[in-house]
A protein has these predicted regions:
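Conserved glycine-rich cofactor-binding loop
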Residues: 16-18
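Short C-terminal tail/terminal secondary-structure segment
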Residues: 93-96, 147, 223, 234-251
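C-terminal helical subdomain
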Residues: 119, 181-184, 201-229, 233, ...
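Active-site helix of classical SDR
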Residues: 122, 158, 166
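Residue(s) in the substrate-gating loop at a strand-loop-helix junction
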Residues: 142
Length: 251
């Protein structure tokens, strides 16, 4: 299928698989050119092959590395001449357990990767293109950042911070750049499989829509928040959760 070029360019972090890949796929499908980042060079190469090497480039590196943040934006600018959209999807969640037993060094790692890296990419994109030319930023948060979730407190804490970062950047970058967040519930990815592995039907039964999320669900939301249809939306967190939060008001 031939896709008409939109003339827009997106940088999507953590996009070799899972939610990030789903977002990149949605943006490519509507005609954007996309730069994707990730740690694994082989996985990135495979992602580019699937998405289309004529429209996508890969930039390997660690999200929390400031040099990588700068280099990724620079490489995207060199390849495509602009970076209209930034999607901060890169994240980590290496620990499950109660906060009382949380290793503080692990907590720092989670915060650095999930929050500080998003700020770093936003700063670099702002300086390189968006300050003078406008655009949009989408931060991938989580429902765990909206309400507490058992055993993933470190992750939830970082995602709550990302939601606040979203509002702060929306205020500071207005009126030229819109900044919004997406807060998914459980999405079927390698990243989240510990939350449903071996019990998917049971986990899905808790959702009013009867299933867990898939990366395409988040891709569609990101495509909306980087489109003209959302031109009067900024500083918001779009919860994409299959209705799971509705259960809080039942009974």
């Amino acid at each position: 299928m031939t896709v008409q070029d939109s003339g827009k360019v997106a940088l999507v972090t953590g996009a070799s698989r899972g939610i990030g890949y789903g977002i990149a796929e949605a943006l490519v499908a509507r005609g954007d050119r996309v730069a994707i980042t990730g740690r694994g060079e082989d996985a990135l190469k495979e992602a580019v092959e699937r998405l289309g090497a004529d429209r996508v480039i890969a930039i390997p590196g660690k999200a929390h590395d400031e040099a990588h943040q700068a280099a990724a934006v620079e490489r995207a600018m060199e390849a495509f001449g602009r970076v209209d959209y930034l999607v901060n999807n890169a994240g980590t969640n290496p620990v499950f357990g109660p906060m009382a037993e949380l290793d503080l060094n692990v907590a720092r790692k989670v915060y650095e990767t999930n929050v500080i890296s998003a700020l770093g990419f936003a700063q670099q994109t702002w300086k390189a293109w968006q300050k003078e030319n406008g655009g949009a930023i989408v931060n991938i948060a989580s429902v765990a950042g909206v309400a507490p979730s058992p055993f993933i407190g470190a992750y939830g804490m970082s995602k709550a911070a990302m939601i606040n970062l979203t509002a702060q950047l929306a205020h500071e970058f207005a009126p030229v750049v819109r900044v919004n967040a997406i807060a998914p519930a459980v999405v079927k990815t390698k990243f989240a499989e510990a939350l449903y592995e071996g019990r998917e039907a049971e986990a899905a039964a808790a959702y009013p829509l009867g299933r867990l999320g898939v990366p395409e669900d988040i891709g569609g939301a990101a495509a909306f928040l980087t489109s003209a249809q959302s031109d009067w939306i900024t500083g918001q967190t779009l919860v994409v959760d299959g209705g799971i939060f509705l259960n809080a008001g039942v009974g």
